[in-house]
Amino acid sequence: MRIAYETMLAEFERVLTKYGFSPERAHEAAEIFAQNSLAGVFSHGLNRFPRVVEYLRKGEIDPTSEAECIASFGAMERWDGKRGFGPLNAKHAMDRAVELAHQFGIGMVALGNNNHWMRGGTYGWQAADAGCIGICWSNTCPNMPAWGAKDNHIGNNPLILAVPRSNGEHIMVDCALSQFSYGKLETMRLAGKQLPVVGGYDADGSLTTDPAAIEETRRMIPIGYWKGSGLSILLDMIGTILTGANSVATIGTFGDEVGLTQIMIAIDPAKFQSADLTDAVIDAIAADVASSEPAEPGREVRCPGMGEHRSRKENMELGIPVAEEKWAEVLAM
């Protein structure tokens, strides 16, 4: 089943308006969810939308609250998200980081006390659209064991790196620090598929490719094993220092995944060189990667983010594939 982009956008906008968003903010927020689905990231588009509505119903998200700057020094600012709508606060924070980068060459906004930003790649892509290198990350609730542990004390804190291309075909890594995000586990389970590689442990303590089994135990494995575990811990520390807000451990006391810490960094390469030279560097590296001999005959080797361009084009032309039960939930709201 496929749904036209404009239809999906209109339904998201209708629901958000119903739950207290102004028409302008409802449209801006709905675009984020619809664009995520258009890009093929259903886990943080349609599939995540009902959960956000549940948070609105419970009063965990204030649809009228807007983040504000509470401290600044040169190219750095600290913002309080006031537990408002996470994606809009994050978008506005990256907008400001880009403004600072255009002024100083680099800009950083440390956004504390925000709610879930949905897909972190939204903000890396946003920076790249503005001609900037984008670096951003968020912490989470404790949802992953540290390396060597059984219980969850660290987050699968998503990390995003994006580089801009003048033609809009940016290169971007958008990854949770678990082998698979919980959103991806849900997407694979709904599709009735196994994971391509092991992603965590089942109830017997065995490594498994069964997404439902990992969702049940909540014992995911970090990317790179101990390396991903260490990276998660340090990102949490750096983010908490810069925001003066909530660590993974503190978020774990809130009951729901709210009050998160997020860092937005933008770097303007035009301060050093022309966009043509930046494009040439990216194109040369991408071409070299693509020239690799594939491990499996006929398999494409490519840079991260390149599949997204194809998904956007295909889904705009043919409609966005949806899980029927998720779409029915939205229509019933």
PLM regions: where:
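Acidic, glycine/proline-rich low-complexity segments that act as flexible tails and inter-domain linkers
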Residues: 2-3, 9-29, 34-35, 42-60, ...
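Catalytic-core signal marking the mid-to-C-terminal active-site face
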Residues: 2-3, 8, 18, 242, ...
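Active-site cofactor/substrate anionic-group-binding motifs, chiefly glycine-
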Residues: 45-100
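A generic, well-ordered mixed alpha/beta core segment in the N-terminal half of proteins
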Residues: 77-166
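Phosphate/diphosphate-binding glycine-rich loops and adjacent basic-rich segments that engage nucleotide
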Residues: 144-212
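N-terminal nucleophile
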Residues: 154, 158-161, 176, 230-246, ...
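Secondary-shell segments that build the walls of catalytic and ion/ligand-binding clefts
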Residues: 190-251
